[in-house]
């Protein structure tokens, strides 16, 4: 009986110690305040499960919740001088600063527009294979509009710019261009060697992006952290000739789509555009080979 009373008293003291001042653990009350914030995506959920002690630790009095993707919330208070410094040390929260400060919100308007462009790519490929070039021209114009909008929004609104967007925007362009060139080559509107050159360059660039992601990821490197879109490690900056090359490639796509509609598939100007596209593609590949390291900006503190 005495042992039971001692155990009950110790449990009551422990509950009071972890309870914020003035809070009562009633039904649906401050218990919810002690829970960690909800994960915004599957990547955050997987990373939080890997770091369970940090994700499910109780918040200390005087601190506010910190969302993983936006990095919002106030930092922990500075430890007081003297004997209280050890009690207020950051290690009491079980949170790794490098893990929480690396997160950003991936759900921005430019990123959604880039994903929309990726979704339109197979639709365009199907329309070209079905030789429905009139509708394909309209869908291609819509895809081009999303490309213009995401760049305009990211440049003019700072909260819409993200490290993920710096990689997702060119990736969407490469997916769209690759599917369009393969489909147009199948329809005998673009020569095979030109398509092979463009696809080879894009495959090498995509492989380089995955390699940069691996190299800039802090240890320990895990699959959950690698494929987490909220975890930003580097920003990619395309070269000037690469931007020119993308514009020339899209002009060739538009001209090739319109060729069957306006009956100029055998025009000499279209063949000149083939040569210009081949030149800019080769020059773009060389620019990335020569200035490769300058196109990658590693985010500080990662």
Swiss-Prot record:
Bilayer disposition of the protein: Multi-pass membrane protein
Record field: transmembrane: 109-129, 133-153, 190-212, 250-270, 271-289
InterPro entries in UniProt: CDP-alcohol_PTase-I (IPR050324), CDP-OH_P_trans (IPR000462), CDP-OH_PTrfase_TM_dom (IPR043130)
Compartment(s) of residence: Mitochondrion inner membrane
Entry keyword Amino-acid biosynthesis: no
Cofactors required: a divalent metal cation
Domain of life: Eukaryota
Ranges for region Disordered: 65-84
Keywords: Lipid biosynthesis, Lipid metabolism, Membrane, Mitochondrion, Mitochondrion inner membrane, Phospholipid biosynthesis, Phospholipid metabolism, Transferase, Transmembrane, Transmembrane helix
Pfam name, any one: CDP-OH_P_transf
Gene Ontology CC: one annotated term: mitochondrial inner membrane
Role: Catalyzes the synthesis of cardiolipin (CL) (diphosphatidylglycerol) by specifically transferring a phosphatidyl group from CDP-diacylglycerol to phosphatidylglycerol (PG). CL is a key phospholipid in mitochondrial membranes and plays important roles in maintaining the functional integrity and dynamics of mitochondria under both optimal and stress conditions.
Family designation: Belongs to the CDP-alcohol phosphatidyltransferase class-I family.
The protein's name in its UniProt record: Cardiolipin synthase (CMP-forming)
Species name: Rattus norvegicus (Rat)
Gene: Crls1
């Amino acid at each position: 009986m005495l042992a039971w009373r001692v155990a009950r008293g110790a449990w009551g003291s422990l509950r009071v110690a972890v309870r914020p001042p003035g809070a009562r653990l009633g039904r649906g009350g401050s218990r919810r305040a002690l829970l960690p914030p909800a994960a915004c995506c599957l990547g955050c959920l997987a990373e939080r499960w890997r770091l369970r002690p940090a994700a499910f630790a109780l918040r200390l009095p005087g601190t506010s919740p910190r969302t993983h993707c936006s990095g919002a919330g106030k930092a922990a208070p500075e430890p007081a001088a003297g004997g209280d410094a050890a009690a207020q040390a950051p290690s009491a929260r079980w949170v790794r600063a490098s893990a929480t400060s690396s997160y950003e919100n991936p759900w921005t308007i430019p990123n959604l527009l880039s994903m929309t462009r990726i979704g339109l790519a197979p639709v365009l490929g199907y329309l070209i294979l079905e030789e429905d070039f009139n509708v394909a021209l309209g869908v291609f114009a819509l895809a081009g509009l999303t490309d213009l909008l995401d760049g305009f929004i990211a440049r003019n609104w700072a909260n819409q710019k993200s490290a993920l967007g710096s990689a997702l925007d060119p990736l969407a362009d490469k997916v769209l261009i690759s599917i369009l060139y393969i489909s147009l080559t199948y329809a005998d509107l673009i020569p095979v060697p030109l398509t092979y050159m463009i696809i080879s360059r894009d495959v090498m660039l995509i492989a380089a992006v995955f390699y940069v992601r691996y190299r800039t990821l802090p240890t320990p490197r895990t699959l959950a952290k690698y494929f987490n879109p909220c975890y930003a490690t580097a920003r990619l900056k395309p070269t000037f000739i690469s931007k020119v090359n993308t514009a020339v490639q899209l002009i060739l796509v538009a001209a090739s789509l319109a060729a069957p509609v306006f009956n100029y598939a055998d025009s000499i100007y279209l063949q000149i555009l083939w040569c210009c596209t081949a030149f800019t593609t080769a020059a773009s590949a060389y620019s990335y080979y020569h200035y490769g390291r300058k196109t990658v900006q590693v985010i500080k503190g990662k």
